[in-house]
Amino acid sequence: MLQPSRRKFRKEQKGRNTGIATRGANVSFGDFGLKATERGRLTARQIEAARRAISRHVKRGGRIWIRIFPDKPISQKPAEVRMGNGKGNPEYYVAEIQPGKVLYEINGVPEELAREAFTLAAAKLPLRCTFVSRQIGA
């Protein structure tokens, strides 16, 4: 499971996820990518589930890059606890996703196989995604 090894502060404020992705919006490592078209949050478990779906579909071929990392802690209070008495403990980590962000990349496989693998991965994620390929000269 992906999570930061060390943090300066354990807890973080909620914040607002606005704007579109300017960094990480192009396919830069592989030949094909899975790009988010909506904004949202991806938990470490969702990122791992999609990664497994991709790697199982392409079997031994290809190389996969995960372009996102869950670095934002989400805190929760235990069940049946009254309001107040401070903020809950960090329970899991999420990656905040803006539209246009490339989530996964792959190379070393045919386009049809990559498209099928990313379709399986997109089904595991709570946001709409699209298949993209590398721009020549970019």
From Swiss-Prot:
Any one GO MF annotation of this record: rRNA binding
Record Pfam families: Ribosomal_L16
Gene3D superfamilies: Ribosomal protein L10e/L16
Sequence segments annotated as region (Disordered): 1-22
Record's compositionally biased regions (Basic residues): 1-13
Keywords, ordered alphabetically: Ribonucleoprotein, Ribosomal protein, RNA-binding, rRNA-binding, tRNA-binding
One GO term (biological process): translation
Entries under PROSITE patterns matching the protein: RIBOSOMAL_L16_1
GO cellular component terms given for this protein: cytosolic large ribosomal subunit
InterPro entries to which the protein is assigned, alphabetical: Ribosomal_uL16, Ribosomal_uL16_bact-type, Ribosomal_uL16_CS, Ribosomal_uL16_dom, Ribosomal_uL16_sf
The keyword Iron appears for this protein: no
Oligomer and partners: Part of the 50S ribosomal subunit.
Protein role: Binds 23S rRNA and is also seen to make contacts with the A and possibly P site tRNAs.
NCBIfam families: rplP_bact
Protein family per UniProt: Belongs to the universal ribosomal protein uL16 family.
Name of the protein this chain belongs to: Large ribosomal subunit protein uL16
Gene (UniProt): rplP
